[in-house]
Amino acid sequence: MINKNNVLLQAEEMIKPLVLEHVPQDSDVEAVIDQWLHAIATDSQFYCNPKISKSEQLKERVISLLKKNGLYTTRSAFFNDVFGALKLKPELDANFRFIDLFAGIGGVRLGFQQNGGVCVFSSEFDKHAQQTYKNNHGEIPFGDITKIPANEIPDHDVLLAGFPCQPFSHAGLKLGIEDTRGTLFHDIANILETKKPKFALLENVKGLISHDKGYTLKVILKTLTEMGYSCNIPKHVIEHGSTKEIQTLAKEMVLKSVDFGIPQNRQRIYIVLWRAGEVKSFEYPKPLGIEVKVGDVLEENPEPKLTISDRLWEGHQRRKIENKKNGKGFGFGLVTEASPYTNTISARYYKDGSEVLIDQAGKNPRKISPREAARLQGFPDEFEPSASKVQAYKQFGNSVTVNVIDVLAKKIRDILDGIN
């Protein structure tokens, strides 16, 4: 938990009455309070309802109030008051600004923050993930993104989103963004159309490529190219090519965690989009060629209770044999310290029978610890997992591999530096 200093506590109480009329449906008051204080500290735009106030005028009013009460002297000092207790903090003077949608516990945020970016708005529906996000990033994310008007979101250079895979209507790809109505992707597209950031990074499971026989991916890309965005698949292919051709070209967007210094066989699709006319192209990162092994992420003295019981171990082995016979997959993945990688860690770790198990000489294998799950996703040891082990496994399983985000963020940052 964060130990807030007196200035931060007083500032929160002081601005709360002003915040209340700007809180969107299904979001906490604390989310707007945090966003305002962070916006002052990082010189970013306020989230606000434009029907009530203009963002810059509201920000000036709040800063004036804080100054009058001795809570604000300089931005640098206020930055230290706001972020001083955080182990993972942004830079005082950011190179670019981004928003973090479907944020989870902030894995995507970390990758961009450590490359000089600052988060100006975050959104996450799950209350447990929100709390972990707060403990590490100092802010409660806004809630249901479908209840937040796009024009109220602060200006940003990069939109980041890891969204669920949902099918679209087969009405005929005739209505553009309206073809996506009723899906969470529609809200992402609406924000892109309204705010027009220079870049967007959309992360999803590799299965998005084959989802609904490639139709889902085609709708996503066609919708965004019609809004003025480009990706590594040519526009004429997206508009007139077959779904098979799009699927083939989309394979370049799939990156493996093990190729970027993390011993986990996790594959995800990372759709990088840029504003046509502002950015010429984007080259996906190549594997780093770093040799890794599972032992790199293991703790020296794991808790004895991580070792699984005889009954559980026998059940795992029996189900693995049965699954293999029935062609249902092979269940758990048993690895040693010398193994080059684990299988993919999932949000249902230790519930679906496909978990990572660590071999132990002379005794039953063991589960990985929450800290090891964090390391398998590239989270630094300074990151504070949920106090609930069930939630910690779920949150890391649902997250991204920070190392992969880091290399993508570096490339996007370099292009933005060239533009700016």
Regions found by a protein language model. Give the residues of each.
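C-terminal target-recognition/interaction regions appended to catalytic cores
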Residues: 1-89, 311-420
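Class I S-adenosyl-L-methionine
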Residues: 148-158, 168-344, 348-350
